[in-house]
Curated annotation (Swiss-Prot):
Region (Large ATPase domain (RuvB-L)) location: 1-182
Protein name: Holliday junction branch migration complex subunit RuvB
Gene of this entry: ruvB
Native source organism of the sequence: Oceanobacillus iheyensis (strain DSM 14371 / CIP 107618 / JCM 11309 / KCTC 3954 / HTE831)
Principal cellular location given in the protein's record: cytoplasm
Lineage, broadest ranks: Bacteria, Bacillati, Bacillota, Bacilli, Bacillales
Top-rank taxon: Bacteria
GO cellular component: cytoplasm; Holliday junction resolvase complex
Record's keyword terms, sorted: ATP-binding, Cytoplasm, DNA damage, DNA recombination, DNA repair, DNA-binding, Hydrolase, Nucleotide-binding
Enzyme type, top EC level: hydrolase
């Protein structure tokens, strides 16, 4: 799958900009008010007891700030931040090397925690619960188990697919926080903050337009703003205007609802090929030339959020809201 401008997953182009824009404290973090409120209390209580924070699971769609929140937790606790990902930890020995290097109270962030190999996950159970790991050294009759004691630490796991976590792993997290898609007003604040960091003021109307087409996702808002800034600077504007914003977003084929050409292809494919459904996921995938998993994990969540598509026992169905947005009449309508 090619990188999409409105894909919430982290892309190479995002890494540098996200590091420069990342807030360091909960007070600087915009949105997710309930999650922030809870974390503030939990962090304060842990610091009062002089204990590490309970293990934290952050879950929700990509691009909503899970990695940022993990780094903020370490900053607020006054400890070091270590970061890795589930696919990067292939063996129990890889995990042992990371855990044994932690200092007391450190935050270990594991992105895509649902992708940890089962053998690694089983080693993690004791590390999270009792702060030790057992490592088998050698093979055959001479093999022996060695116990390594670990300093108390906080594991922050992040996942876009909480349903794939095993129950034993999920139950070892003391704090579970779901990140939701952002409201327009919060995205506007993020866009204005980013524009300020870029030293390129933006009009309130332009900020609203970027926010409205960002699929409720800060990462997408910042990515779109970079391209809007390009147009505005080429035109010699001192402030990003609504006109330049609309021009840039039209060039990027991002419509008023935040849908791009791939979303349109998926929706119109079901409408034109299958009368709006119901139609099975594998059939849709074959029709538009994408993998079923990609459709289910990347394209569908926002379309479901908008109410443009429904999942039914018989397959996917396009809703009347989607027909109205696309300007297509249902078969049989006058």
């Amino acid at each position: 799958m090619d990188d999409r401008m409105i894909d919430g997953e982290l892309q190479d182009q995002d890494v540098e900009i996200e590091l420069s824009l990342r807030p360091s404290t909960l007070s600087q973090y915009i949105g997710q008010d309930k999650v922030k409120e809870n974390l503030t209390i939990f962090i304060q209580a842990a610091k009062m007891r002089e204990e590490p924070l309970d293990h934290v699971l952050l879950y929700g769609p990509p691009g909503l700030g899970k990695t940022t929140l993990a780094s903020i937790i370490s900053y607020e606790m006054g400890v070091q931040f270590r970061s890795t990902s589930g696919p990067a930890i292939e063996r129990a020995g890889d995990l042992a090397a990371i855990l044994s290097s932690l200092e007391p109270g450190d935050v270990l962030f594991i992105d895509e925690v649902h992708r940890l190999p089962r053998s690694v996950e089983e080693v993690l159970y004791a590390a999270m619960e009792d702060f030790f790991i057992d490592i088998v050294i050698g093979t055959g009759p001479s093999a022996r188990s060695v116990r390594i004691d670990l300093p108390p630490f906080t594991l922050v796991g992040a996942t876009t697919r909480a349903g794939l976590l095993s129950a034993p792993l999920r139950d070892r997290f003391g704090v579970l926080s779901r990140l939701e898609y952002y409201e327009i007003k919060d995205l506007c604040n993020i866009v204005e903050r980013t524009a300020d960091i870029f030293n390129m003021p933006i009009s309130s109307e332009a900020a609203i337009e970027v926010a409205r087409r960002s699929r409720g996702t800060p990462r997408i808002a910042n990515r779109l703003l970079k391209r809007v800034r390009d147009i505005s600077q080429v035109k010699g504007e001192e402030e990003i205007s609504l006109e330049s914003t609309k021009q840039a977003l039209e060039m990027l084929q991002v419509d008023d609802a935040g849908l791009d050409h791939v979303d349109h292809k998926l929706l119109t494919g079901i409408i034109e090929g299958f009368s709006g459904g119901p139609v099975g996921l594998d059939t849709i995938a074959a029709t538009i030339g994408e993998e079923s998993q990609t459709i289910e994990e990347v394209y569908e969540p926002f379309l479901l959020q908008l109410g443009f598509i429904q999942r039914t026992p018989r397959g996917r169905v396009i809703t009347s809201k989607a027909y109205d947005h696309l300007g297509i009449k249902r078969t049989g309508e006058d």
